């Protein structure tokens, strides 16, 4: 069966919400035209043209009609395919740290080749000389401390060629669990200004505890850590200010030896009317045995156009090792974000491949996006890839890109309020306990307070690996989820399910053995969706859970990473499940990174590379948790991926439980006011309640209900949620704001135990388009909460207003409360 891997949104899944505001004229209806050999898609704000010349299809121009800018695309390739693997060495990487006079520079390269600068810092941040060199596996604070959770699988690796070699030690080997520290601490000679070492991950599978080298200064708080996240060359460079992740390209993009210029157009370029726009389509063929169907689409009301290519082999199977499908000739383009799958932007445009694992190459001529892969094309097996190019009016890049995402994402964003059992029942989850939870939530939230609960998610611990692959535990769920569903039906309740495509954590070896026993994967293989039988089994099992268990949400954990056959199959599984239920919510956790292009396929991703629940800063354990929650959202989403919509971030929700980290937060008391008010104002559509009903008071339920209702009433504007203020990890006041022409919201929080001030200008706070700054400059904000100390706040564009926040105070405002 042909795998049709779509990067476009399924028909009928376009957002029912009003469009995000476009800072320019209304784009209007799409049109297409042919003039000689040139075909064009256009509307009121843009046009894009392609030309058939000597039988070859090539781009010619992009015109921004709002500014009159014309971007010449002649010489750009529609696509480039790689037919040979990209050589990346043996998976070990040379890293260098140089303490220059003005800067501290980090460089890296495969086996010492093609060394590139991957990070730099002011030398003033690292005064004097380091005191220690630490090598091995350590936490992100360069400390020899273990992860609080699962130890993870055992592995081994090495730090080699350490130079200079303190105490004559040039290498360090380790073997141990992935999430446990193994560190060698060595003295650092005064006056030494550089360090180099080769880091070989070997079989180690850690993420945050990846093999690393770290220089540590006298105060113990100043440090610089450089770790290798994976064999593909993802690095984490961490200081006291936070973590940076980067995936530099040490060699040119995938070779791109088969270009679109080598393909001939079969017949003519077809103009196709769509239900809500216009499309162009052409069939292309090459003498290399690969055929392609190119398509360009401009939907009505769009400020962007999309292109897709469907690739297949005409005869014998064809190995594909890379795809480049965004070549935009616009000087000034830059990558926006530090993670894989970051878009390009500049010169009034944004662009990118709709693939979360893509990488960018920026040149003086413009920017290109590509990804390496290992895929086999055949007449029966084809793949579809997509790219986008759009307009970004001055000062409105974030909102312009958000508008594109909201129009094209896999499922329209909307609040998905649900219960998750992890910090309540933990591994003790079973049917009786889940039914008790459903009854309690139905009584306290649904009936008493009028708050709908969309799902009750069963997290890890529900299956019985010794009895089969992802089968319900015979003691915990004796009648299977179908029986549980029948008992939940009177409440109108649905189940959500945690499941791992790669087998999860505890019990993963047994699950793998079960798959091998059933012939789903080879006898010596690990779980991997690229095996057709296992993939089909996984799809069928998820469908069965949806059909028989009434499951309306999946939490895919340990999902895998990198553009591989498994990765491609994973995204296709999501597509297939949406064919059965377009509203199914798919949250992907471990194995993701904050590329906004995930959202073309799934609904939300986790703030990977931080603890699930952690504590930092001041106050009690609940306030420290809030500072951790928002601090790492700021670091891992806002800073690492400025164009990732915060409405699609997984934060680990509201926590008041008795299991695992939930117990520590729960012991801080049941005053949830600050937590729920700050959480529901962040715009997240994945609204998680990790609550133990027996620990809740009537007041606690009231706070949850009031904030959830407020968020649901402001769901439209909260899609625009964006960051305001400083860094919570530095105890700076911060918040979230959202704006559209109809509403605005603002949340502020002080993470310090001392009063702190924050300056607010409506222009900056609400990220206002230029026209709005003059047409509607004033904002009369009021609080929806009667007990809030500051009930009203007036802001104006171009005028700074100083607000003083009391210790740990949370303030929430909107433009329609009390009207």
Where are these regions (language model features)?
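Active-site-proximal substrate-binding groove within the catalytic cores of carbohydrate-active enzymes
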Residues: 42-44, 55-57, 62, 380, ...
